[in-house]
A protein has these predicted regions:
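Conserved ABC transporter NBD signature motif
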Residues: 59-70, 74
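Conserved ABC ATPase "signature" region
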Residues: 98, 102-126
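Conserved catalytic motifs of ABC-family nucleotide-binding domains
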Residues: 151
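Catalytic Walker B motif of ABC-type/P-loop ATPase nucleotide-binding domains
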Residues: 155-159
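ABC ATPase "signature
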Residues: 214-215
Length: 268
């Protein structure tokens, strides 16, 4: 069975600027993959390539076994929530989902998901109100409902809790956890590291278009602690590995590439 997401020496350049410099990942089906990196590291570029919105400059990528150059085959499997999700202020949540179903030419079974999704995402009582009247949290839930409307196998989320108040952010995190519990693959990019630490099975850390660390959150913490003890990383990190956070690891590996994961092979 092919991986849910796989890339092989994936590159992307914009003129003289390199956004991705040989990305290699293999993400099993049903996994939550936390994708971290500073601004400009290549996270959004990666997601846009994997959802067929951007053409790579080189290398290969597959989603559910379908090559990203086969757009029609890939989009059957994916849902994508960009950092600024498109919502239509003058439509109601129900109208927006119906519009998306028409746009994507969804079948009857997929259209039958509209009302259950409105209920599940806590929008049933406001389903017939214009989206312009919604709070930011409600707007994000409406956008997320649209992302999963076609019942995708792989869900790409770019900063899904950005700008939300704590209660709304918790609701969105719970919804993401529920989607993962259903066996979907979730590719999650966020700057809110506790969200990744809470939800992700595996974390990949990107810097300068390269994967500089990858592993389970607890494993990354142990490896960072071992490197700190060996004097390979900065001394500002936590002295007790049980107190080390994913933020400590992220700051360490993105500022100092003396230790890293899979990218060691690709960097040569």
């Amino acid at each position: 069975m092919p991986a849910a997401i796989e890339t092989d020496s994936l590159t992307k350049s914009y003129g003289d600027t390199t956004a991705l410099a040989g990305l290699d990942v293999s993400i099993p089906r049903g996994e939550v993959y936390g994708f971290l990196g500073p601004n400009g590291a290549g996270k959004t570029t990666t997601m846009r390539i994997l959802t067929t919105l951007t053409t790579p400059s080189g290398g290969d990528a597959w989603v559910m076994g379908e090559h990203v150059t086969d757009r029609d085959a890939v989009v059957e499997h994916v849902g994508y929530l960009p950092e600024t999700p498109p919502v239509y202020d003058e439509l109601t949540a129900r109208e927006q989902l119906t519009y998306l179903a028409d746009l994507r030419d969804l079948d009857a079974a997929q259209r039958d998901r509209i009302d259950p999704l409105l209920e599940r995402f806590g929008l049933a009582d406001a389903a017939n109100d214009p989206i312009r009247t919604y709070s930011k949290g409600m707007r994000q839930k409406a956008a997320l409902a649209g992302t999963v409307l076609q019942d995708p196998d792989v869900i790409f989320l770019d900063e899904p809790t950005s700008g939300l108040d704590p209660r709304a952010a918790r609701t969105v995190r719970d919804l993401v956890a529920d989607l993962a519990d259903e066996g979907r693959t979730v590719f999650l990019s966020t700057h809110i590291l506790p969200v990744v630490e809470e939800l992700a099975d595996t974390v990949g850390m990107l810097a300068n278009g390269r994967l500089v660390a990858e592993g389970a959150p607890a494993d990354l913490k142990r490896r960072a602690e071992a490197s700190a003890e060996a004097g390979l990383t900065g001394s500002d990190s936590a002295s007790d590995p049980t107190e080390r956070t994913l933020e400590d690891v992220f700051l360490s590996v993105t500022e100092d590439h003396a230790w890293h994961g899979k990218s060691a092979e690709s960097e040569g």
